[in-house]
A protein has these predicted regions:
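PLP-dependent aminotransferase-like
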Residues: 102-159
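Short acidic capping loops at alpha-helix termini that bridge into adjacent secondary structure
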Residues: 32, 82-86, 106-109, 153, ...
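Active-site pre-lysine segment of PLP-dependent enzymes
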Residues: 143-152, 165-188, 192-223
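N-terminal "arm"/small-domain region of PLP-dependent enzymes with the aminotransferase-like
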Residues: 1-62
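PLP-dependent aminotransferase class I/II
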Residues: 46, 67, 215-292, 296-299
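PLP-dependent enzyme catalytic core of the Aspartate aminotransferase-like
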Residues: 320-324, 328-329, 333-362
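Conserved PLP-binding catalytic core of the aspartate aminotransferase-like
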Residues: 281, 291-324
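Phosphate-binding glycine-rich loop
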Residues: 61, 66-109
Length: 362
């Protein structure tokens, strides 16, 4: 197969997603498992989104709206961004891939912080690009070091704010200085998958920053706050030119009918999003206090997930927790072998996590 395989993917391994509950229970013959591994919404999907799905089941024999007009119109009105500066994706993951495919040629350079979302590097390497990874400083992205890594061959910079897996954020002033110093011919991808969870008012959203760099691309998702991870729907904001080039290679029906309808409805469900944010903040307080009582170190977060340092190592704790029916995330693949990552669950899920963690550590 090597002769047929693209050089860029020869050494890649598949993305390691969080283990599904069904898979764990099938493999281990257990019931009543919980999953705190994939930063999902513990409340499930927005009720208004569920109703919108039901209302659109009778048109599934028709192709989706390839332009995404109604969802893009809702986003345009909500965020005051022109329609032709918005693009929809099959999750924001597809928009990451479209960015790389549209703007990266073999041998071009890309810069990211590290550790960060694993998909950036996979997409870049698959396209034959070269990735420069800048180590985090005290679990935060150091934008000055990111700038130092930029070369004349750099085409794209990936910034994850808040950063996954650390949950740390970049402040408004940091981002403004950074965007001012990035060359105008370098695309800055600002991945804001978790921005809706941020409570720190010193953090600027990508919408505030769009006018501060000509090639800023802001990516968001309906998977986290809105609870629509299973539908795969995301969106991006940028100036007209990058959006135009991405649309040239975008699949014509990349956002399916049910995903568009559900996302459109979810944007109206402020009661659901407020409830989600309250559960996350209450859950973080409980989890922080419990971990303090256990004398375990953790990295405070601005998101719905955070890192916990475990003396036995992340992989060992992950495996022990699996046997107890609790799915978490080992951070080995992120280069943080002493850490696990969990997302906030419902109160009873958080309590079960703490109880199980105490058990496997004893």
């Amino acid at each position: 197969m090597k002769k047929l395989t693209s050089k860029g993917i020869e050494d890649l391994i598949p993305y390691p997603p969080g283990k599904p509950i069904e898979e764990l229970e099938r493999e281990m013959g257990i019931k009543g498992s919980i999953k705190l591994a994939s930063n999902e919404n513990p409340l499930g999907p927005s009720p208004m989104a569920i109703q919108a799905i039901k209302d659109n089941l009778n048109i599934l024999h028709r192709y989706p709206d390839g332009s995404g007009y109604y969802l893009k119109s809702k986003l345009s009105k909500k965020y005051n961004v022109p329609l032709d500066q918005i693009i929809l994706g099959n999750g924001s993951n597809e928009l990451i891939e479209l960015t790389v495919r549209a703007f990266l040629s073999p041998g071009d350079h890309v810069v990211q912080a590290s550790p960060t979302f694993l998909l950036y590097e996979k997409m870049v390497k698959a396209a034959g690009g070269q990735m420069a990874s800048v180590p985090l400083s005290n679990f935060r992205i150091d934008l000055n070091e990111v700038l130092k890594a930029v070369t004349p061959k750099t085409k794209i910079i990936f910034i994850n704010n808040p950063n996954n897996p650390t949950g740390s954020v970049l402040l408004r002033e940091e981002m403004l200085h950074f965007l001012n110093d990035v060359p105008d011919d370098v695309i800055v991808v600002l991945d804001e998958a978790y921005i809706e969870f941020v409570s720190d008012e010193a953090v600027a959203t990508g919408l505030e920053l769009l006018t501060h760099h000509p090639l800023l691309l802001v990516l968001r998702t309906f998977s986290k706050l809105y609870g629509l991870a299973g539908l795969r729907i995301g969106y991006g904001f940028a100036s007209k030119k990058p959006i135009d080039y991405m649309n040239r290679i975008r699949q014509p029906f990349n956002a399916n009918t049910l995903a568009q309808a559900a996302a459109n409805a979810a944007l109206e469900d402020s009661e659901f999003t407020s409830q989600t944010l309250k559960i996350v903040r209450d859950g973080l307080r409980y989890l922080y206090q419990s971990l303090n009582d256990m004398e375990l170190e953790y990295i405070p977060t601005q998101t719905n997930f955070f890192l916990i340092k475990v003396p036995q190592g992340g992989k060992k704790i992950y495996e022990l927790m699996l046997k107890e029916g609790v799915i978490i995330r080992s951070m080995d693949s992120y280069g943080l072998p002493q850490y696990i990552r969990i997302n906030v669950g419902l109160r009873e899920e958080n309590e079960r996590f703490i109880k199980t963690l105490r058990k496997v550590q004893s």
